[in-house]
């Protein structure tokens, strides 16, 4: 699933490379002339190399839980790596649950700092992407993938967010309270919140691909009013407004 994270003015330069390889969803770069950038909940963890004080500094950040100003709004240039929803690199597992709506400087990680020092302010996106993919070795960061968190996330994705906690418990064979506890400890949000984010992301996909016929029914909303309210809470726009703005290419997401 191609997740959408940012509401960005057309004055901001944004480019992305979609990977969707089971670990990394996409790589992206933002050149920002001091414009505000809003973040949409996406259920993902990001690794961002932010240009500040003449050098690139590595940060990790978690998902937002509602539409809000992104931390990168005041940064001139950002090279970002968005992991797949529900995927937690090994080095983040001890604190990933604390990253919701915040970010952490990880300059103390030698491997990431070694990548950062190879980036130049005027370097092209393609060159930066080549450097990152050459030095970020999956075997070093994803040694343990088969776990209950990945299983839960997979169920939620397959159901487009339209699944109850009790259904997940039945499919996994675990107690509901146990599942919700370990899921929140790992990702920082409850299974219910995570499912809600995935549902909105699916709605965005439908809107961007003109698959608008009875979206609210396909995504399990009570009625259209319920869908509109939830969509606006998560994106700041009504579905109709979002569709118009997107069709006019006034925003990059």
Model segments located where?
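Flexible coil/turn residues that form the inter-helical turn or adjacent wing/linker of helix-turn-helix
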Residues: 161, 208-210
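Alpha-helical DNA-contacting segments of helix-turn-helix folds
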Residues: 143-148, 155-156, 182-207, 230-247
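Conserved active-site tyrosine of GNAT-family acetyltransferases
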Residues: 227, 231, 253
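Membrane-associated alpha-helical segments
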Residues: 212-213, 228
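Alpha-helical bundle regulatory/interaction domains
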Residues: 1-149, 157-158, 165-166, 172-176, ...
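Aromatic-anchored, glycine/proline-accented short structural segments
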Residues: 168-176, 180-181, 194-198
């Amino acid at each position: 699933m191609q997740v959408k994270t940012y509401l960005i003015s057309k004055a901001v330069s944004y480019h992305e490379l979609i990977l969707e390889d089971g670990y990394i969803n996409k790589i992206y770069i933002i050149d920002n002339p001091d414009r505000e950038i809003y973040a949409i909940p996406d259920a993902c963890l990001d690794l961002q190399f932010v240009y500040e004080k003449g050098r690139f500094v590595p940060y990790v950040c978690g998902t937002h839980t509602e539409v809000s100003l992104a931390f990168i709004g005041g940064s001139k240039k950002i090279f970002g790596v968005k992991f797949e929803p529900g995927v937690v690199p090994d080095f983040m597992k001890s604190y990933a649950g604390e990253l919701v709506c915040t970010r952490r400087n990880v300059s103390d990680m030698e491997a990431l700092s070694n990548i950062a020092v190879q980036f130049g302010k005027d370097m092209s996106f393609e060159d930066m992407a080549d450097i990152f993919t050459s030095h970020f070795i999956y075997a070093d960061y994803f040694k343990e993938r088969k776990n209950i968190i990945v299983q839960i996330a997979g169920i939620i994705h397959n159901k487009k967010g339209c699944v109850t906690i009790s259904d997940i418990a039945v499919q996994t064979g675990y107690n509901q309270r146990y599942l919700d506890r370990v899921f929140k400890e790992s990702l920082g949000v409850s299974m219910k919140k995570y499912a809600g984010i995935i549902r909105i992301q699916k709605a965005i996909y439908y809107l961007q691909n003109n698959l608008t016929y009875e979206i609210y029914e396909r995504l399990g909303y009570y009625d259209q009013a319920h869908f509109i309210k939830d969509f606006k809470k998560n994106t700041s726009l009504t579905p109709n407004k979002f569709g118009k703005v997107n069709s006019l290419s006034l925003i990059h997401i």
